[in-house]
Structure formats: structure tokens, C-alpha cells
Amino acid sequence: MKQKAKDENVLAQNRQARHDYFIKDTYEAGIALTGTEIKSVRARHVTLRDGYVQIINGSAFLENVHIDEYKEGNRYNHDPLRSRRLLLHKKEIAKLADVKAQKGMTIVPLKVYLKHGFAKVLIGVAQGKKEYDKRETIKKRDQDRELRRKYRI
């Protein structure tokens, strides 16, 4: 049986997160979704840009992630911006709570993908970049692009 490429299962990515934050660590978490939500996710109608993870009473929740209403969902449709529970081990949630308590640290979703038929989200422990850090990153990326262009000819 032919193996699928890993990127083929990626349904949404948060490219802005890598630009705005230094990603220190990543965790894979399951997402508790309703029927119409998983159908919208499979149709790639997910926006992660403004999302973040909040820890409330020992549970992790994905906040401010927009999953469009399912077109065929009629009256059973979901609220596009509702909080969605993340499925993590208690020890992982405790680690994330400790990290989030530190000043300047946050937890952001990086990508949503399917793994063995289940929707998963890759969350990253992140530290915000300053404006000069962003400019430095852009400058380095431009230099790398110029070098590749120069040696390709």
C-alpha cells in the first residue's frame, strides 16, 4: 500500500506564528470537535491566525480559532469561534500551565492535521518577538535567498 506524504494531511497552518514568536517547544494534542466542525476541518475551512491556548481548571482549551460553519449543517451548525477542548495528558497540561505562568510566554496553535483519521493540532510554546527580531529574521531570510539564487546560476 502506498504511503501518503506527511504534508498532504495538513489542513491549516499558522504561518504568522513563526513570524511573531520564537517557538520554544511543541506538543501534539487532539481536538474535541462536533460533527459539523470536523466536516468543516476536513474541508480546510480553518483559520488559526489569532488562536491561542488557555488553561482553565486543569483543562486546555483552544480559543479564538475560527472554524467556518458547515455549508450543509443547517440548524445543527456550531458557533465558529467557540472554545474547543484540547486532549492532552495531565502532566503535559501541568507543564503548559507552568510555562504560561512565566512572563512573556504564550501557547499558540501552529497547524491542524489529520492523523489516523483524527484531527490533531500542533501547539507551540512561544515567546514574543520584538520588532528588531522580526526585521533580523526577514534580513536573514533575504540573504539566504540571495545566496541560493547566486549559486544556482
From Swiss-Prot:
Any Gene Ontology CC annotation: cytosol
Annotated localization: Cytoplasm
UniProt cross-references to Gene3D superfamilies, sorted A to Z: 2.40.280.10
PROSITE patterns: SSRP
Keyword terms of this UniProt record: Cytoplasm, RNA-binding
PANTHER family with a match to the protein in the record: SSRA-BINDING PROTEIN, TMRNA-BINDING COMPONENT OF TRANS-TRANSLATION TAGGING COMPLEX
Protein name: SsrA-binding protein
Source species of the chain: Lactobacillus delbrueckii subsp. bulgaricus (strain ATCC 11842 / DSM 20081 / BCRC 10696 / JCM 1002 / NBRC 13953 / NCIMB 11778 / NCTC 12712 / WDCM 00102 / Lb 14)
